[in-house]
């Protein structure tokens, strides 16, 4: 059930993302680290999705990185649109600023599902998403640590 929920979260995380055009996505990421620590589920020139090798972890993570078109990335309302989308799905917004949104998607029977989405233009226009399934409620600090971990994959 947890794995299905996480897959669903990963699909939701990519709902508003469009592809960009220049270098391959892997040129912006620490692929050696990703290959050694995670299972790559999907990879092409525009996006990569990788998951924890240990599927029985108490906090299971799916990371998605996707290049965006400049016009979509520059949209000042992209976070507001994500917020509206999540609120329409009865999710709880934990944190939101101009480039990041952290959402509690599901809390049921000691299972928690979170989505973290952020946008980064330090190398190219990227959307980074972390979908998390956990058997315990995560603190805001723990969620920000997962956001920092996602950012640590950037070269």
Regions found by a protein language model. Name each.
Residues 49-77, 127-133:
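A short acidic-to-branched-hydrophobic micro-motif
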Residues 20-54, 85, 149-153:
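N-terminal "mature-domain start" segment
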Residues 130-155:
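Surface-exposed amphipathic alpha-helical segments
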Residues 44-47, 56-59, 108-116:
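Short, surface-exposed coil-to-beta transition loops
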Residues 31-36, 53-56, 66, 96-99, ...:
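Short, solvent-exposed coil/turn segments at beta-strand boundaries
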Residues 1-4:
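Positively charged n-region of N-terminal signal peptides that target proteins for export
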Residues 15-18:
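C-terminal motif of bacterial Sec signal peptides marking the signal peptidase cleavage site
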């Amino acid at each position: 059930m947890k794995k299905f929920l996480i897959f669903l979260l990963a699909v939701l995380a990519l709902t508003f993302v469009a592809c960009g055009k220049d270098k391959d996505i892997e040129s912006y990421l620490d692929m050696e680290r990703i290959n050694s620590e995670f299972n790559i589920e999907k990879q092409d020139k525009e996006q990569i999705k990788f998951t924890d090798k240990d599927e029985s972890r108490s906090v299971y993570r799916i990371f998605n990185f996707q290049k965006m078109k400049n016009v979509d990335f520059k949209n000042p309302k992209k976070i507001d649109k994500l917020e509206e989308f999540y609120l329409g799905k009865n999710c709880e917004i934990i944190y939101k600023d101009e480039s990041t949104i952290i959402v509690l998607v599901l809390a049921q029977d000691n299972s928690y599902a979170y989505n973290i989405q952020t946008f980064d233009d330090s190398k190219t226009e990227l959307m980074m998403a972390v979908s998390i399934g956990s058997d315990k409620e995560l603190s805001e600090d723990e969620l920000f640590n997962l956001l920092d971990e996602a950012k640590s994959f950037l070269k």
